Amino acid sequence: MTTSHQPQDRYKAVWLIFFVLGLGTLLPWNFFMTATKYFTNRLDVSQNVSSDTDQSCESTKALADPTVALPARSSLSAIFNNVMTLCAMLPLLVFTCLNSFLHQRISQSVRILGSLLAILLVFLVTAALVKVEMDALIFFVITMIKIVLINSFGAILQASLFGLAGVLPANYTAPIMSGQGLAGFFTSVAMICAIASGSELSESAFGYFITACAVVILAILCYLALPRTEFYRHYLQLNLAGPAEQETKLDLISKGEEPKGRREESGVPGPNSPPTNRNQSIKAILKSICVPALSVCFIFTVTIGLFPAVTAEVESSIAGTSPWKSYFIPVACFLNFNVFDWLGRSLTAVCMWPGQDSRWLPVLVASRIVFIPLLMLCNVKARHCGAQRHHFVFKHDAWFIAFMAAFAFSNGYLASLCMCFGPKKVKPAEAETAGNIMSFFLCLGLALGAVLSFLLRALV
């Protein structure tokens, strides 16, 4: 058995598998965030979501329009979003960083399958708890523990997938990014359907969690099928040295096992390598990928700084009392963003301009800073109740919709380009490590964006 020929990705099977895996990394967490109103409702001491029809209707309205106030908010409910952000971003950043350094010590299959199974278990528990009543404090603590677990395993899963895609051709990072973009689209559609149906918030949340479980199971099945494809085995073998052992290794790979000697043979320092050599290797990779790494960090810093902290606070100037008032944020903000973000991510499958060494790439990335004043000068409601804003420049809904479309498309396209280019700027043996480091900088951008969002919202 040899690898002298270069097999084709028959029926785009590997591309589709990575697409589903990308979908599986973000869809569960997106559904979790979409159900935020369900969690805050259960923490309100004066109401129970499932016991009062009128309050359920108010909850559904709140899902559509964040300005609708829920009665008698508890202190736990009031701090839920802030604590959720903290419990999400810190593990995401920490575990992505750890994965960048420790992926040589833990096999790829353990990291990916273990993470998917852990996320599946958390969502099964979350779905079951929808039907269980408990004290608000206990529910709050359990929810935060679940958020930490989801984002910890999600960070390991995402970084491992980008590292795995790094050993394949450059355009195989694109399906991961595209799948993640589609995850946002699905959750936006689910949110709009929940509003239109008028269903109770607890029922909508249960549907979100069960759907997330189904997607994770599909991702597990796809990952198990990946080693059976000749295309994947071929490119994985290219990262292994020692032609005399190729046949044995390919047999192991076909069974879904990772060759024991992969770490040492791939040129990536193993667990017993001197720390100095390992550090020098990582420093060399960082130097090679610094431009795409810093670019993807900057992209997500700007994006998360504005979306949704600022953009979700924009009000329609033409809705009045029409139904558009309830649908404005779900459609003009969330659905609009997720559709164009997905289109931008997907475009890299057929177009990768500018090139990985072009100066235009960092220039285009830096130019996205213009969206900060553009979106902040839209019809954003005042931070304090009763306060009036007088410095609207782009008050009409059309301005906001157009800016959001360009904002989202540039985010998806440029971020996907950077994630594709990063692993291709190093030797093939270092591609997996480069992919993990790129994932770390992506998560760093998310964390910095979360911090920036507080500042930008305070300035409105």
Curated annotation (Swiss-Prot):
GO terms for cellular component: apical plasma membrane; basolateral plasma membrane; plasma membrane; postsynapse; presynapse. Residues 1-12, 108-111, 158-174, 228-291, 343-359, 418-435 are cytoplasmic. Glycosylated. Keywords: Cell membrane, Glycoprotein, Membrane, Phosphoprotein, Transmembrane, Transmembrane helix, Transport. The chain crosses the membrane at residues 13-29, 83-107, 112-130, 139-157, 175-199, 207-227, 292-311, 324-342, 360-378, 398-417, 436-456. Residues 30-82, 131-138, 200-206, 312-323, 379-397, 457-460 are extracellular. One of its GO terms (molecular function) is adenine transmembrane transporter activity. The keyword RNA-binding does not apply. SUPFAM superfamilies: MFS general substrate transporter. The keyword Cell membrane applies. It is a multi-pass membrane protein. InterPro entries: ENT1/ENT2, Eqnu_transpt, MFS_trans_sf. Transporter activity is sensitive to low concentrations of the inhibitor nitrobenzylmercaptopurine riboside (NBMPR). GO terms for biological process: adenine transport; adenosine transport; cellular response to glucose stimulus; cellular response to hypoxia; cytidine transport; excitatory postsynaptic potential; hypoxanthine transport; inosine transport. It is found in: Basolateral cell membrane; Apical cell membrane; Cell membrane. Glycans are attached at residue 48. The modification Phosphoserine is found at residues 254, 273. Uniporter involved in the facilitative transport of nucleosides and nucleobases, and contributes to maintaining their cellular homeostasis. Functions as a Na(+)-independent transporter. Involved in the transport of nucleosides such as adenosine, guanosine, inosine, uridine, thymidine and cytidine. Also transports purine (hypoxanthine, adenine, guanine) and pyrimidine nucleobases (thymine, uracil). Mediates basolateral nucleoside uptake into Sertoli cells, thereby regulating the transport of nucleosides in testis across the blood-testis-barrier. Belongs to the SLC29A/ENT transporter (TC 2.A.57) family. Cys-418 near TM10 is a major determinant of nucleobase transport activity. This is Equilibrative nucleoside transporter 1. It comes from Mus musculus. The gene is Slc29a1.
